[in-house]
Amino acid sequence: YTTLFRSSIIVERFGADTLRLYEMFLGPVEQSKPWDTNGIDGVHRFLKKFWGLFYDRQDNYLATDEVPNAAELKAVHKLIKKVTGDIETFSYNTSISAFMICVNELTSLKCSKKVVLEQIVACLAPFTPHICEELWEMLGHNTSVCDAQWPQYNEEYLKEESVNYTVSFNGKARYNKEFPIDADNDTIQKEVIADERSEKWMEGKQIVKVIIVPKKLINIVLK
């Protein structure tokens, strides 16, 4: 009875979607979990951030018909793949983590493109049906989001095109640099040595050797 009472208070304050999402976020469904509402604010902030992809703080509608770029497509298709697999194994908590990561990425990219938002809404609807039903209608649909086709991910959008290397001098990390995923060691070495950020660490010193750990690290040994 106490838990039901607390639940009704949460619904009144945060809404039913926040409660649903929070309960699924607590951990694997097969495990018993103590009732704890300490993290519910974070879940509510996520939903507000998600809403922020559709409307700004002045309540201006943001969704556009623009074509998404590679980074935006990668973010949403990575999400679709993760959630599709997680739902099959009832791993709802990790799905919600994936939603949070995706929304953070799209917020950073300032992405409010309908084709991207539609797919997220369709994926999120089983978790938060009320807000998703409203957003689905705002995106121009006359039917319920419950009748929407489940999005399909495309592996082509998930391919890594570049790799982020940590550049170190005598074992101490100094900066990071992106390289095409197919860049060879000679190209990587030449570009790092020519990078203006390397100058102050190499000034007055001699290169003994360059160690390249594929897709991870470049260490320039100096004396």
Task: Describe these PLM feature segments.
Residues 1-4:
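Short, small-residue-biased leader/transition segments that mark boundaries at the very start
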Residues 182-202:
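A short, contiguous, amphipathic alpha-helix enriched in charged residues
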Residues 178-180, 223:
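Residue-level structural signal for beta-strand termini and adjacent loop
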